[in-house]
Amino acid sequence: MLRFVVGTYTHLIYGVDADIERKKCKPLWLFEAHEGALTALAVDGIYLASTSSDETIKIFDHTRNVQIADVSVPTDIANACIRDMCFTKNHLLACHDNGQISMWSKGSWLLVHTLKSSSHKGITGIAVHPSEKLALTVGGDGKLRLWDLVRGKGGKVLPLSTIPESILFLNESSFVIMSRRGIDAFKLDLTSLFSFSSKSQLNALCLYQSKLIVGRDNGTVLVLDTSDGKILHEFTAHKKRVKSVYPVDDYLITASSDGSVCIWDKDWNLVIEHNIPEGNRITCMVAMLADSNSEPKNVEDEAAKRQSLDSETSETSSESESESEYYSTSKQPPVKRTKHA
């Protein structure tokens, strides 16, 4: 069973379980998660993080359908809208429109670092090295920046020939930078590996089956060789622009701005197509394996805490909803356990 979650321009998060064997999709939840358009999602284990133009981050346990944290960005950051974020082993990283990076400790959601740069044009993409000791970012100022994640400091700044949109590590020794019309691959010493240009605008990229997957404005998906950038395969995935591409298990999931989500096998055959409710334009997507038997650690203690909190809430409020009711009708999570700056 696969699970994908999309964020929309209309402030909504929509979660769906996809049964590959039966080729059926089961909607799990559709709710208003933020006060602005969703700009990024990130997933790691049980944690699902969402952010939007309202400059907040919310953390959900997607295995139990409950919000577990409401993380605010540092109060001294102006223009704090987040364009990209990702998890590492111990942290959640978020990139802001003012060129800064915030780091929170995973689990406690306490702010541990604010990495600052001289740029005020915004970071649009971040890639963390497999060692998790350094990160690379790109942004609206057309520069590549190196960050030391161990010491929490910025490093080298290098100008690029294009305005980049996204960045991705291919392995420990190479990475790719995507702009609207092309892709450039480099080694860590900045030796060029290959360059690829496209007539149609590029919107999304990921690694899948050791190949580079690129989603384009014309609805097509390109499969590129990571060694030389040559096109290995090309197929039409959607009628309109491909907004997101995401690998999970042996499958590739693509999402279009028109609200359609498609699951493809390793031979590029369409397995399942699902459409989110009409009028909700997709802005971002993540996917994961959905294991009905998986539970977070200390689940009994957490369940007891949640029951206690629910009891306290029922004593002070005349309105009460179960978690299942919330995920079909409510706009706010049933439980907000922590809030950190």
UniProtKB/Swiss-Prot annotation:
SUPFAM superfamilies: WD40 repeat-like
Stored PROSITE patterns: WD_REPEATS_1, WD_REPEATS_2, WD_REPEATS_REGION
WD repeat ranges, renumbered to this chain: 33-70, 77-114, 119-157, 197-234, 237-274
GO biological process: maturation of LSU-rRNA from tricistronic rRNA transcript (SSU-rRNA, 5.8S rRNA, LSU-rRNA); regulation of actin cytoskeleton organization; regulation of microtubule cytoskeleton organization; ribosome biogenesis; signaling
GO cellular component terms listed in the entry, alphabetical order: nucleolus; nucleus; preribosome
Entry keyword Repeat: yes
InterPro entries: PAK1-Kinase_Regulator, PQQ_b-propeller_rpt, WD40/YVTN_repeat-like_dom_sf, WD40_repeat_CS, WD40_repeat_dom_sf, WD40_rpt
Pfam assignment, any one: WD40
GO molecular function: protein kinase inhibitor activity
Region of interest (Disordered), residue spans: 293-341
Ranges of compositional bias, category Basic and acidic residues: 297-309
Keyword terms: Repeat, WD repeat
Highest taxon listed in the record's lineage: Eukaryota
Transmembrane segments: none
Record function comment: Negatively regulates pak1/shk1 kinase activity leading to proper execution of cytoskeletal remodeling and cytokinetic functions.
Alphabetical list of PANTHER family matching this protein: P21-ACTIVATED PROTEIN KINASE-INTERACTING PROTEIN 1, PAK1 INTERACTING PROTEIN 1
Protein known as: Shk1 kinase-binding protein 15
Organism this protein belongs to: Schizosaccharomyces pombe (strain 972 / ATCC 24843) (Fission yeast)
Gene: skb15
